[in-house]
Design a protein with these regions (language model features):
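Flexible, gly/pro- and Lys/Arg-enriched active-site loops
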Residues: 43-50, 65-68, 72-168
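Catalytic domains of carbohydrate-active enzymes, especially glycoside hydrolases
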Residues: 205-221
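Short, surface-exposed acidic-centric catalytic microdomains
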Residues: 20-64
């Protein structure tokens, strides 16, 4: 039987509690899907911490009563202590739907009565919002209304979609585009190779400057992926990036750090050193151990589309419909990650501008972000166009480091069309451009 379960927490490291609960649900059922994550105001007893809320869909052979008891055991094992009705809790698991069954049991082994569908569902925007992420067209067996219709009838303005971080922090995905600053500690990257790899101190100072300029995330890479670049060993990649991550954390830098790698061994070392996100240009395909690692650790991932490698990619830019094909690939890799145990709320997708795409194809991907998002079911979207060759081909600017204005145009269009994050070299200029854009939009 397919069952929808709501998850909520407002104590301690809320996202860790939700991730742990999802894994524990996976021990009593098969987790089929999970929603995005929402930061919400407490609805009934309002004088308490804000909640994080999500919904998952699982498949189970357990009866409704046995499934409820299993959920209550998870709550108890995770340290939930009864306080007062609608009060704070480490974890809360509510059964929303049990297939299309209607269930009403007065008492379940000393617990409150079991009512399915959940009797307060229709008034809870904090439940309907994440439920709509994964089942917008599901029909309530009693009211005959779809979830998206039910959501439209309640106020869910206070449900803020967020991107969780392992340390308990979070990034707001709704208010404005997030800026990821690029820190290449490589000798051969296409626009800044050899600039920041001379010493750990030099790289660390540049990261600090990008943070001061407005970077929300620092993305550290130790291998160039420009067309024609030679691959490096995992050991060399780790030698370049791990000391920088460690030094930033030792310096008290709390900004999220993303490690740009497709090697699980490098990713694991980076996570242990303090990395918050793994940015995998192969979407977990090049190293079969990558997605299981992220399912184990709960560290978020960026899944990017590419074809071939740095040597062969330019020959593989052949598509009938680049937007459809790239978006479908990102959706497919998302579904693979979900099956591996990575929650939807821990995933961002990247169309991979410049990776096996020509200028026309890159421009189409930016121009049709709306269609792209529709195909991926509104997965958070990262756009990484900074200083790339297609910008030079459109603008005539040959020197990559001088493509600031062309990059800015892509950034603004991406923000307008619905991307949540942009990866750039020129953080200060990007921050100023976005400040002006949002200043105008809010007037």
């Amino acid at each position: 039987m397919k069952v929808f379960v709501a998850l909520g927490s407002n104590l301690g490291n809320r996202q860790k509690h939700l991730f742990t609960a999802l894994k524990k649900l996976g021990s009593i059922a098969t987790v089929l899907d999970s929603s995005f994550l929402y930061d919400t105001k407490a609805m009934y007893e309002t004088d308490q911490n804000r909640f994080l809320n999500a919904v998952c869909r699982v498949e189970t052979d357990l009866s409704p009563t046995d499934f409820l008891l299993a959920c209550k055991k998870i709550e108890k094992d995770m340290g939930r202590v009864k306080t007062y009705r609608m009060g704070p809790r480490v974890i809360d698991l509510d059964i929303l739907f049990y297939g299309n069954d209607v269930v009403h049991i007065d008492k379940v082994e000393g617990l409150d009565n079991l009512v399915i569908p959940h009797e307060r569902l229709q008034e809870r925007g904090f439940v309907l919002k994440p439920l709509c992420d994964i089942a917008p067209d599901f029909i309530h067996p009693l009211t005959g209304k779809t979830i998206k219709d039910m959501l439209a009838s309640v106020n869910s303005d206070d449900c803020v979609r967020i991107f969780p971080l392992p340390d308990g922090g979070m990034l707001n995905l709704q208010d404005r585009m997030l800026i990821m600053g690029i820190l290449n500690v490589t000798p051969d990257s296409f626009s800044d190779g050899g600039k920041w790899n001379a010493s750990v101190e030099q790289a660390t100072e540049h990261a600090k400057q990008m943070i001061a300029d407005g970077a929300d995330i620092i993305d550290i890479g130790g291998e160039s992926t420009r067309p024609g670049a030679a691959a490096v060993t995992e050991e060399e990649e780790a030698r370049r990036v791990i000391p920088v991550i460690r030094r930033l954390r030792e310096a008290g830098i709390a900004v999220p750090i993303s490690v740009d790698t497709y090697h699980s061994k490098v990713a694991r070392q980076a996570i242990e050193a303090g990395a918050s996100i793994v940015n995998d240009i192969s979407a977990g395909e090049d190293d079969p151990a990558m997605l299981p690692l992220l399912a184990e650790t709960g560290v978020p991932v960026i899944l990017m589309h590419k074809r071939g490698n740095a040597v062969t990619m330019d020959k593989q830019a052949v598509y009938r419909d680049v937007v459809k094909e790239v978006a479908e690939y990102c959706l497919d890799r998302t579904e693979v990650a979900l099956r591996m145990g990575i929650p939807r709320w821990n995933i961002i997708v990247d169309p991979g501008l410049g990776f096996a795409k020509n200028t026309q194809q890159n421009c189409a991907l930016v121009n049709e972000i709306g269609r792209f998002n529709g195909i991926t079911k509104n997965m958070p979207l990262l756009i990484a166009a900074s200083r790339k060759r297609f910008i030079g081909e459109v603008t005539g600017v040959k020197n990559a480091a001088d493509r600031v204005m062309g990059t800015a145009a892509v950034t603004l269009l991406s923000a307008e069309k619905g991307a949540q994050m942009v990866r750039v070299h020129d953080v200060k200029q990007t921050k100023e451009i976005l400040d002006m854009y949002y200043g105008i939009c809010k007037e």
